[in-house]
Design a protein with these regions (language model features):
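A conserved FAD-binding loop/helix module that cradles the flavin
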Residues: 68, 493-516
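Mid-domain catalytic core of redox enzymes
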Residues: 266-392
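A glycine-rich dinucleotide-binding beta-alpha-beta segment and adjacent secondary-structure elements
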Residues: 195-210, 374-380, 433-498
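N-terminal glycine-rich phosphate/pyrophosphate-binding loop and immediately adjacent elements
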Residues: 14-151
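Helical element adjacent to the flavin cofactor pocket in flavoenzyme catalytic cores
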Residues: 225-279
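Flavin-binding catalytic cores
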Residues: 127, 338-339, 372-375, 413-454
């Protein structure tokens, strides 16, 4: 492929150090960090608003999050914390009670309280001894929290952070933590607790990912989300999730980055095995001195933005087996009163997991994996006005539920209708008479989610499955477990690459870090070697 040619309207080629394609939260993190280093950075976003899947819509007095809503990992992430977003208007809101789990026609439920002692007391009432086991788990979390989160969000392999983790735990305890990372969540619960309450909290939190509860890795995810919830709650940006994206944009612009919305990338130009620039959707051509970072899906980068001649056959074949996470269906409801939950634990909870106990979750997940529409859904629920009263008029509730459809039926209208009806029946069983308070609704099908954000293919809000076979070295395809591509100076900085889905900024941080390292004179040989290794790998037959 030949390099960029031609001129812009001013009679000259626009040249910058780096172009970031896509202003999702990862792209904005990349832009801020590159601009901090003195780079001239241009961010282009085809939507009219920045944020990608970190977005809200405002309709009168109602503020509704379009995609993600509650972000414990964002609050705990060292990447986002180090950006100082509180200086750019970000404020976190918390519900009185972070979480409750209601299984079936549960009249009581189990709550995760803000104070771990209160959580432990509830668990102990359900099964004596579980309270002490809970506090032991919390104590271990507090010891490993910082090195573990850094290890999960840093480049692969996380040698330095793993060493700090071992030093924190000791050689006797570290192997047990490594084993726990491989456990299915139901086995993790069985080994630590005698009652159902803690098991439901762990398994419900594991369902924030698409890892089946019987699969390796679901234990780690359930434990991580549960301990984060016990540590920082399930917070949401005050005024809507869009406020997080707004703060990231302001932070990037304060560092000197330029952010343009309403204009996307049409083509990434490569010549001689190295990125040269980007042709924009409005006809402009932008040459880059150093890098292009794509905050896009891997498919968008390799199948649309790059010329087919610039994509090795081995990479195309590997990408064809990329697995998306389960399609998401989201039901947004406006109620003129609080939800009439029968379970006291549900009142005042910001997030709820509703519909099944642990055996029920195993059956629900198996139905989805078998390609069937579950007869009885499991849903994640957000009471956003309970978390943040500014989301709706006083005395009302902005409520959402989301659940999943089988992978191969995201556009099936009958499956969507049946699942919406199932969610309505589930809500009626737990909060009789809720529908009498409904004053508005907004259903987001998998197709709607993808239409609003092209990275969410088929309604896959995680940017690809989070199961172990597609993490680290295998995300998005077999490689080196990082943002580098087979093209020099071209980086993938989205949830499609390690460390994967979630609002944490790690993918954008790693892309910026790699670009900065490869641009320094002492880092260039290593960068060229890694790019060459990827080119060799993808030229081989998978």
């Amino acid at each position: 492929m030949i390099g960029l040619t031609g001129q812009d309207e001013g009679g000259r080629m626009q040249t910058v150090d780096a172009v970031v394609v896509g202003a999702g939260h990862h792209g904005l993190v990349t832009a801020a960090l590159l601009a901090d280093a003195g780079w001239d950075v241009l961010v282009v976003e085809e939507r009219d608003e920045v944020g990608g899947a970190v977005a809200s819509r405002v309709d009168g007095d109602w503020v509704e999050d379009e995609f993600s809503a509650c972000h414990p990992l964002a609050l705990a992430s060292p990447v986002l914390r180090d950006l100082g977003l509180e200086h750019h208007g970000l404020e976190w809101a918390h519900a009185p009670r972070p979480l409750a789990h209601l299984a079936g026609r549960d009249r009581d439920g189990i709550a995760l309280h803000a104070d771990p002692l209160d959580t432990a007391a509830d668990l102990d009432r359900g099964h004596p001894g579980d309270g002490a086991a809970w506090l032991e788990m919390v104590e271990q979390w507090q010891r490993v929290r910082e090195p573990l989160i850094r290890a999960l969000l840093t480049r692969w392999p996380p040698v330095a952070d793993a060493a700090r983790l071992v030093a924190r735990l000791g050689l006797r305890e570290a192997p047990d933590l490594a084993r726990m990372a491989l456990l299915p969540v139901h086995q993790l619960a069985r080994e630590h607790f005698g009652g159902d309450g803690a098991a439901q909290l762990l398994a419900g939190n594991a369902m924030h990912a698409d890892i089946p509860p019987t699969a390796p890795g679901s234990g780690l995810y359930g434990w991580l989300m549960t301990m984060l919830c016990q540590d920082v709650g399930f917070p949401s940006p005050r005024g809507g999730t869009q406020q997080l994206a707004r703060a990231l944009r302001l932070r990037a612009e304060a560092a000197g980055a330029r952010v343009e919305t309403g204009v996307g990338a049409g083509r990434v130009v490569v010549a001689g095995g190295r990125v040269h620039g980007v042709e924009l959707s409005d006809g402009r051509r932008v040459r880059v001195r150093r890098a292009v970072v794509a905050d896009t899906s891997a498919q968008r980068l390799y199948e649309d933005l790059l010329d087919p001649a610039d994509v090795p056959a081995g990479l195309r074949r590997r990408l064809a087996r990329f697995a998306w996470d389960l399609p998401t269906l989201k039901l947004n409801l406006r109620l003129d009163a609080p939800v009439p939950w029968t379970a006291p634990q549900a009142r005042g909870a910001g997030v709820l997991h509703v519909g099944h106990d642990v055996p029920g979750l195993i059956r629900w997940s198996a139905e989805l994996e078998a390609g069937e529409v579950p007869g009885a859904p499991f849903a994640l629920v957000g009471q956003m006005s309970t978390i943040d009263p500014s989301r709706s008029p006083e005395g009302t509730e902005a409520l959402w539920l989301y659940t999943h459809l089988p992978r191969h039926r995201p556009a099936d209208a009958a499956a969507v209708a049946a699942t919406v009806e199932g969610c309505e029946r589930l809500l009626e069983s737990l909060a009789p008479g809720w529908s009498q308070h409904e004053v508005g609704r907004w259903v987001q099908t998998p197709g709607d989610l993808e239409g609003a954000d092209a990275n969410l293919v088929g309604g896959a809000v995680g940017g690809g499955t989070q199961q172990l076979f597609q993490q680290a070295l295998w995300r998005p395809v077999t490689g080196l477990g990082g943002p580098r591509t087979h093209v020099g100076g071209l980086y993938l900085g989205s949830a499609a690459t390690h460390p994967g889905g979630g609002v944490h900024g790690g993918c954008g941080h790693l892309a910026a870090r790699a670009a900065l390292q490869d641009a320094r004179w002492w880092g260039r040989p290593r960068g060229r070697a890694l790019t060459g290794a990827l080119r060799w790998l993808h030229d081989e037959q998978p």
